[in-house]
Amino acid sequence: MTTTMEYHNPVLLHPTVDGLDIKPDGIYVDVTFGGGGHSKEILRRLGPNGKLFAFDQDEDALANALPDERFTLINENFRFIKRFLRFHGIKAVDGILADLGVSSHQFDVPERGFSTRFDAELDMRMSQKNDLNAYRVVNEYEEQDLRRVFFDYGELKNAPVLARTIVEARHHRPIKTTDELKEVLKKYLPEKVRNKILAQIYQAIRIEVNQEMDVLKEFIEQSLEILKPGGRFSVISYHSLEDRLVKRFIKNGMFEGEPERDFYGNFSVPFKTIGKLIVPDDEEIKINNRARSAKLRIAEKI
């Protein structure tokens, strides 16, 4: 049986949970349950009357459900956090934790198609219930849409040529696997930067398949609605696109533009930042390579 640590090494475990400033009788939400590492630590700090709700859209995570009467696991995308908490009678919470991106488990299961290390069918769905997968993005998207995906989500300067090359190749036969995709794009993968560019290409397709940026925006906006005044928001991001959204919303209460002003002309913002940006130390990165790009931001609702 797969253990929690094999499934997912919790990144920045103690700083992330410390950031929630756990109240023993509080109500908390872990929106990225995975192997349950962060949830276990939250439960350890909760008293007998505290509650923890966890979300994970990946069906594989259900095997890690914790046998604790204070704990409820919801097999849904966290973009629906408000809806499903209300279903359970919860309208306001004391803290929300999010460990964004792909779990170690998802990267390590070849058939999921997330990792550049394995050949697999083009899938990349975080939930097998979703209709859109990587095969459809690669084989059905118009050239201009592929260009947008690679430019916006992979931050690839050669997005136009990558999109054109894929469209020309699939005209002859469908691109069905990750190795076939690598073969199609091999002349744009020089050895020195091959892994970096591949990671950017995979990231771009994965974000599109799972609508990650739209999901993140919806989640952050709903989190503001359901957090109590003084409630904590503790978020780990792994790439600049995620971190930029989190940082802007914490700072301004919006993703673009200037924050609103109050009657006296002062900026009206919903959060105050708690502490500085936290990143893993060398020791954690040595133990858990996934932590190398992690950035933790903590905020408190005003």
UniProtKB/Swiss-Prot annotation:
Locations listed in the record: Cytoplasm
One GO CC annotation: cytoplasm
UniProt keywords, alphabetically: Cytoplasm, Methyltransferase, rRNA processing, S-adenosyl-L-methionine, Transferase
Molecular function per GO: rRNA (cytosine-N4-)-methyltransferase activity
Pfam families per UniProt: Methyltransf_5
UniProt entry tagged with the keyword Cell membrane: no
Annotated SUPFAM superfamilies: Putative methyltransferase TM0872, insert domain (SSF81799), S-adenosyl-L-methionine-dependent methyltransferases (SSF53335)
Binding site for S-adenosyl-L-methionine: G36, G37, H38, D56, F84, D99, Q106
Biological processes per GO annotation: rRNA base methylation
Catalyzed chemical reaction(s): cytidine(1402) in 16S rRNA + S-adenosyl-L-methionine = N(4)-methylcytidine(1402) in 16S rRNA + S-adenosyl-L-homocysteine + H(+)
Top-level taxon of origin: Bacteria
Family: Belongs to the methyltransferase superfamily. RsmH family.
PANTHER family: 12S RRNA N4-METHYLCYTIDINE METHYLTRANSFERASE, S-ADENOSYL-METHYLTRANSFERASE MRAW
Protein purpose: Specifically methylates the N4 position of cytidine in position 1402 (C1402) of 16S rRNA.
UniProt-recorded name of the protein: Ribosomal RNA small subunit methyltransferase H
Organism phylogeny: Bacteria, Pseudomonadati, Bacteroidota, Flavobacteriia, Flavobacteriales
